[in-house]
Structure formats: C-alpha cells, structure tokens
C-alpha cells in the first residue's frame, strides 16, 4: 500500500470522481490541498466572493454535465454559499462544497470565524462532516 498524506488522499478522491475544476477562495487552511491542484489536473478559478464561486460551479456543471466543486473559507465564506447551495438543489445540480473548519479539539470554543458548516447546509441532503 502506498503511503500518502491526507491532502494527497483528498486529491485522489477528487480525481476518481472526475473533478477537473474548482471555484472559490483559497485561504491558509486550504493551501496544502490547493498546492496539489496543478499536478492533479484540477484548474482553480479564483473568485472575489464565495457566492460567485458557488454559482460558477453550479453553472459549469449544468453547462457541461461535469461535476465541479466550490471552496469557501470558514466563517463568512460558508454563509456566502447558502444561495448557491439552494440554487444547485432546486436545479438538481450536484455540487461538491468544501470548507475548512477549526481543529476538532477547538471546535465550539468560538475560534476565529468559526461557524458550524453543517448547520448552514442542512437545506439539502446529503451533508457530511469529514474529520
């Protein structure tokens, strides 16, 4: 079995699911993963606001039939995805939403820009928190 980092495993799963485009805003919590995008053949489209990234991802998937993903920063970035998530839901568009979060041992302690992302995305199913 080949050893790989968590970031490499995440990228491998994206590749296995045919993700070639990601839209959103990259911050420090997501940089180790985004650094692997070019080698993995994933094009990242930087946007000025997470809402735009979510709408771009929805539009890309509807126009091409290929799934993409949106990346949002924790806190305000997550709340900015409410409209795109609901738009994708009503358009029956698969939308992969990826957001960073506080470390498990510090969750719920009111850390910098901490929100519980699953509570904002309960508008649709399924929603998963991956530790």
Give the positions of each predicted feature.
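N-terminal alpha/beta PP-like core and its mobile active-site loop of ThDP/TPP-dependent enzymes
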Residues: 1-123, 129
